[in-house]
């Protein structure tokens, strides 16, 4: 079985993410959407909410598993889950410059390869941060996020602090 992981914080998941994950699902038998938490970041949505939004929006795709990544190195997570490839979307050359050293390190640590998928032109400008900023300022983001995500963003819930379980 060819298994890949699409890691990210997905705060929130948007149509650019969905497009890359759908393309990955066409390349691999199983794609794990690994929702990460960086304890140095302030999140708009809790880990549970981010996972729920991902599950809701990806439910129609076969072979998709949504789970928390947990703490630690992505390469070790891949080894533990039997993943042969990490799939990353690239919006620009600066994304490539950022991702290439990590891809090289992941391959050296555990042999896991990184597959880069260029973003569709319609989504190259998207980021979760930009979507949250435009939303807070009253802009229309409905073209860029799934309806279930839009509903949550418009509900105006306060940002959440990541919780350490332990």
From Swiss-Prot:
- Which positions bind ATP? 9-10, 17, 89-91, 99, 123-129
Tell me what reaction this enzyme catalyses: (R)-4'-phosphopantetheine + ATP + H(+) = 3'-dephospho-CoA + diphosphate
Which residue positions hold the site described Transition state stabilizer? Answer: 17
Q: Which residues bind substrate?
A: 9, 41, 74, 88
One example of a Gene Ontology biological process annotation: coenzyme A biosynthetic process
One of the record's GO cellular component terms: cytoplasm
Q: What is its main location?
A: cytoplasm
Q: Which domain of life is it from?
A: Bacteria
One GO molecular-function annotation for this sequence? pantetheine-phosphate adenylyltransferase activity
Name the Pfam families for this protein.
Answer: CTP_transf_like
Q: Which family does it belong to?
A: Belongs to the bacterial CoaD family.
Q: What's this protein's function?
A: Reversibly transfers an adenylyl group from ATP to 4'-phosphopantetheine, yielding dephospho-CoA (dPCoA) and pyrophosphate.
| Name of this protein | Phosphopantetheine adenylyltransferase
Q: Which organism is it from?
A: Paenarthrobacter aurescens (strain TC1)
């Amino acid at each position: 079985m060819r298994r890949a992981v699409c890691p990210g914080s997905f705060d929130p998941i948007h149509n650019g993410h969905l497009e890359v994950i759908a393309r990955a699902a066409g390349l691999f038998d199983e794609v794990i959407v690994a929702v990460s938490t960086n304890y140095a970041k302030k999140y708009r949505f809790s880990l549970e909410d981010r996972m729920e939004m991902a599950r809701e929006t990806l439910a129609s795709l076969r072979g998709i598993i949504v789970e928390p990544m947990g703490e630690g190195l992505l390469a070790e997570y891949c080894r533990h889950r039997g993943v042969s490839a990490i799939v990353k979307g690239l919006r620009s050359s600066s994304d490539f410059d950022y991702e290439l050293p990590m891809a090289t390190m992941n391959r050296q640590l555990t042999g896991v390869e990184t597959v880069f998928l260029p973003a569709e032109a319609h989504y190259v400008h998207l980021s979760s941060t930009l979507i949250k900023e435009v939303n807070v300022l009253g802009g229309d983001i409905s073209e860029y996020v799934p309806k279930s995500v839009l509903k949550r963003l418009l509900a105006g819930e306060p940002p959440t602090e990541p919780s350490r379980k332990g």
